[in-house]
Amino acid sequence: MSTDSSGNGQAHGGNSDTSRRYPKRPIVGVGAVVLTEDGRVVLVKRGHAPLAGQWSLPGGTLEVGESLEAGVAREIREETGLIVDVGPLVGLFDRILVDDGGAVEYHFVLADYLCRPRQGRLEAGTDVEDAVLADPDALEPYRLTEKARSVISQARAIAGRDR
């Protein structure tokens, strides 16, 4: 498990148990490296904070009573229009974002899965501005986080072993 931020911010109180900003507890999220048969990867441009306007892997928060696999399939469908086969877990990590005052503004525990598109047409859905198929060897224009690039690399290695 790794973390996206250093620093030891303190809890800010949050608006409720379900508030994403200044949460009382970490929020469980799911994400996916959706790899096509020709090896391209699905990326989405985030429409809301955190990461608004930035490219990332598709995903979102888990709903109460939802399994991790069902949650990732739902999020991919909502954000990209694709129906996917959910494969193995690629990694589990946290994303902790601290505000200028040192308080934890966002704290997510994220489970990323390798997925394969089964049907549907790629299009930007809810919570995203755009969705693209990208060459995983040419990701520089998307300015992905180091963690996103690492997860893509790990998923490609897993996909290569599964063939």
Predicted ranges, named:
Residues 94-121:
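Active-site-adjacent beta-strand/loop module that shapes the phosphate/pyrophosphate-binding cleft
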Residues 57-90, 113:
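The catalytic Nudix box helix
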Residues 2-31, 103:
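Acidic, metal-coordinating catalytic segment for phosphate/diphosphate chemistry
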Residues 114, 123-155:
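NUDIX/MutT-family hydrolases
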Residues 50-53:
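A conserved beta-turn-beta hairpin within the catalytic core of GNAT-like acetyltransferases
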Residues 40-41, 122:
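Hydrophobic "anchor" residues
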